[in-house]
From Swiss-Prot:
Belongs to the peptidase C40 family. Its EC number is 3.4.22.-. Residues 1-64, 72-140 form the SH3b domain. Its main location: cytoplasm. Involved in cell sporulation. Hydrolyzes gamma-D-Glu-L-(meso)A2pm linkages only in those peptide units that have a free N-terminal L-alanine. Residues 148-268 form the NlpC/P60 domain. GO terms for cellular component: cytoplasm. Disulfide bonds: none annotated. This is Dipeptidyl-peptidase 6. The active site is at C178 (nucleophile), H224 (proton acceptor), H236. The keyword Protease applies. It is found in: Cytoplasm. It comes from Lysinibacillus sphaericus. Keywords: Cytoplasm, Hydrolase, Protease, Sporulation, Thiol protease.
Length: 271
């Protein structure tokens, strides 16, 4: 059975308990596979990026046919940190839902010119709403960029989360953790990497030597991951810093963090 997330975000827990560890947030419009239905309206699900956990039934829409159609039609994502979907194309209109960066929508006006101020979108429930056109971007389903462009795009995507508060298990501008930041930077550029802070076989990130490291590659530490920006700098969702920020591997740099620079366990790269 397949389903679509219809909440702003579906919290994914390590156990079927609201007090259990939050391990991920599945964003609006993302499809999930229902592996098991449990009592008390809990579901055990697998995301499209192959991460598993427990979510609540009322956060998703159950319907194989609707989900399959949605996967084919919904090819746009929210590019803004937050965006309100409104009932009418005017700022005074009633809000239907607020969505975060990376949420998936069906662009009903996909053939209109890019200078149209408002775009009609369809929600997973079938409801039509409107949002500012510049806040909606085509979804990159698969990475097709040449290496230099891809690396630059991943870096810019990661930097768009600067100052986002740290949230364990978070994956949005409301709050994000280290692996959530890196996985979203790659996902929004068409590459699925493992959600947690380690290199896992079966995913495209492979270990390389540090002398080959370039911008867009990943630095792994014990229980932590960061994205390399080049020039000794890296961006990460730092529990110690309370938010997404930039630090340096260079001990002479004012942004140097010795605790991280001296504990690198691996460098990971798509290339």
């Amino acid at each position: 059975m397949n389903a679509i997330v219809i909440a702003m975000m579906a919290n994914l827990y390590a156990e079927p308990d609201l007090h259990a560890e939050l391990v991920d947030e599945i964003l609006y419009g993302m499809p999930v596979q229902i592996i098991e239905e449990l009592e008390n309206d809990w579901l055990y699900v697998r995301t499209a990026y192959r991460y598993e956990g427990y979510c609540q039934r009322n956060d998703v829409l159950f319907d194989d046919a609707i989900t399959n159609t949605w996967i084919q039609k919904a090819q746009h994502v929210i590019g803004q940190r937050f965006a309100d979907v409104l009932q009418e194309p005017k700022i005074q209109s009633t809000k239907i839902i607020t969505l975060v960066k990376g949420s998936i929508l069906y662009n009903v006006d996909s053939d209109t010119t890019s200078n149209t101020p408002w775009t009609a979108v369809q929600l997973a429930t079938g409801e039509i709403g409107y949002l500012r056109s510049q806040w909606l971007h085509p979804k990159i389903a698969e990475h097709t960029f040449e290496e230099h462009a891809f690396r630059e795009n991943v870096v810019q995507t990661a930097l768009s989360y600067i100052a986002t508060p740290y949230r364990w298990g978070g994956k949005s501008p409301l709050g994000i953790d280290c692996s959530g930041l890196c996985s979203m930077a790659y996902l929004l550029n068409g590459v699925i990497i493992f959600r947690d802070a380690r290199i896992v076989e079966g995913f495209p990130i492979k270990e390389i030597t540090i002398d080959r490291m370039q911008k867009g590659d990943l630095l792994f530490f014990p229980g932590h991951v960061a994205l390399y920006l080049g020039q000794t700098l890296y961006v990460h969702a730092s529990l110690g810093g309370n938010e997404v920020n930039v630090n340096s591997l260079d001990e002479q740099h004012p942004l140097y963090r010795q605790d991280l620079a001296t504990t690198i366990t691996a460098i990971g790269s798509l290339f």
